[in-house]
A protein has these predicted regions:
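Interdomain hinge/linker segments and adjacent boundary elements that couple functional modules
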Residues: 2-16, 20, 24, 29-34, ...
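C-terminal regulatory/effector modules of DNA-binding transcriptional regulators
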Residues: 164, 171, 181-283
């Protein structure tokens, strides 16, 4: 198969998972390449996502690595053979690749959850709120790119508002609800928008109030996307150098535990809706 100039995060993740299976089997690159009937350079390209692969290649590698997890193997085959063109591809070359990657990640997710402290989660944002966030940067974005980013963010909502919505849970700190991105009416509209979403059966919204005692989780913001199998889960976290993608099993398990801890101290869904409703009236 032809080399890819810029593999997507999903394509690179497939290669990473195959590399992990190889390493777990204790095989060197040249040994795995020999089992596949190719060379080390080609295997390196497969593991970096630079070249694609067929179902047969994935299954031969899994067999060489003595992987007996049929669900994982089937999921990897699906990643390798999926040729669906997603809505986000129309933004190729117009927006940073990270925008396309998160849309593709969400498209294939089995469920999503967010923990946010400063801003309303992207899947809950109104158009005006998103425009306000993207406008507040230096140097300012050209108008065309600003509108492209807003449009992309609105289209991401399809995973919770479209014909096949996925389960979504949002833990939102009171600070994110109170910060005015825009004027008073825009903030009220944003809070109302959250309330409308929270009425859906597949969506759960919880508020983390200011008045919690002994709360040390303000650093726990994350976006989490469940894979077809837990080993293919992915978490995104903001760092000083940008957004970091996390996919190691140990780190993902730690983040799931952290999410449960924050969820435990959050208000329940009904109290959260009441809280947001009162806040909207106070503004």
């Amino acid at each position: 198969m032809a080399r890819r100039r810029q593999p997507t995060a999903r394509q690179m993740r497939l290669g990473t998972e195959l590399q992990r299976l190889r390493e777990a089997a204790g095989l060197k690159g040249r040994e795995a390449a020999a089992a596949l009937g190719t060379d080390s350079a080609r295997l390196s390209q497969i593991e970096s996502g630079v070249v694609g692969m067929s179902e047969n290649t994935v299954r031969r590698l899994a067999a060489a690595y003595s992987c007996s997890d049929s669900q994982l193997i089937d999921a990897l085959v699906s990643m390798a053979t999926d040729r669906t063109r997603g809505w986000w591809e129309k933004y190729q070359g117009l927006l940073p690749i990270s925008f396309l990657d998160i849309a593709e990640l969400e498209h294939h997710a089995s469920h999503r959850f967010d923990v946010e402290f400063l801003h309303v989660p992207g899947l809950f944002q109104t158009e005006n709120y998103a425009r306000g966030l993207f406008s507040y940067r230096v140097p300012e974005l050209p108008y065309t790119e600003l509108e492209l980013r807003v449009g992309h963010r609105m289209e991401r909502k399809v995973v919770i508002t479209g014909p096949a919505p996925i389960p979504y849970e949002a833990l939102i700190h009171e600070s994110a609800l109170r910060i005015r991105v825009g004027n008073r009416s825009a903030t009220q509209a944003q809070l109302t928008h959250i309330l409308e979403h929270s009425e859906a059966d597949h969506i759960t919204t919880r508020v983390i109030p200011f008045d919690l005692d002994d709360f040390g989780g303000a650093w726990s913001a994350m976006a989490y996307a469940g894979g077809v199998v837990p080993k293919l889960d992915t978490a995104l976290r903001d760092t000083a150098h940008g957004t970091a993608s996390i996919d190691s099993e140990a780190q993902l398990a730690a983040l799931r535990t952290l999410f449960r801890k924050v969820k435990t101290v959050s208000l329940d869904p009904k109290k959260s809706r009441d809280f947001i409703h009162r806040l909207a009236k106070e503004l």
